[in-house]
Amino acid sequence: MHCPFCSATDTKVIDSRLVSDGHQVRRRRQCLACSERFTTFESAELVMPKVIKSNGNREPFDEDKLSGGLYRSLEKRPVSADLVELALNTIKSKLRATGEREVPSEMIGNFVMDQLKELDKVAYIRFASVYRSFEDIKEFGEEIAKLEK
């Protein structure tokens, strides 16, 4: 690790601790040349699978798109940002856990619906109505009935 103050290459770690639910390590370092202290963060570089769209196109996983869909569904609902972030991390972990290089967009949609069902039933119905393209009020009623079981 290069010192950001003097660019020396010799540093020592003074303190290490886990942050971000154990997905990142925060390290306090001290330069052996100039004695300045600085903080670094370490995390594993995890590759997300490509997404196979319903029309057959393949595109890179877009975390902003996933996040936007969740936040849109939860708009004006009493769910904290921390819970939304936890849901996003859960979805991404499930996608990586498949071990696949490519996953169908349908799988991502189902993971999102599973998380929304736990977070907020109204947000779940909002998302499901768009994701499953509800055509009439009857389909809404059927989905609500499934939730009540």
Swiss-Prot record:
Domain of life: Bacteria
Cofactor(s) in the UniProt record: Zn(2+)
Record key words, sorted: ATP-binding, DNA-binding, Metal-binding, Nucleotide-binding, Repressor, Transcription, Transcription regulation, Zinc, Zinc-finger
InterPro entries: ATP-cone_dom (IPR005144), NrdR-like_N (IPR055173), RNR_NrdR-like (IPR003796)
Cofactor binding remark: Binds 1 zinc ion.
PROSITE patterns reported for this sequence: ATP_CONE
unnamed zinc finger segments: 3-34
Its biological purpose: Negatively regulates transcription of bacterial ribonucleotide reductase nrd genes and operons by binding to NrdR-boxes.
Domain (ATP-cone): residue spans on this chain: 49-139
Organism: Aliivibrio salmonicida (strain LFI1238)
Pfam family, one: ATP-cone
UniProt-listed GO biological process terms: negative regulation of DNA-templated transcription
Designated name of the protein: Transcriptional repressor NrdR
Entry keyword annotation includes Ribosomal protein: no
Keyword Electron transport recorded: no
UniProt-listed NCBIfam families: transcriptional regulator NrdR (TIGR00244)
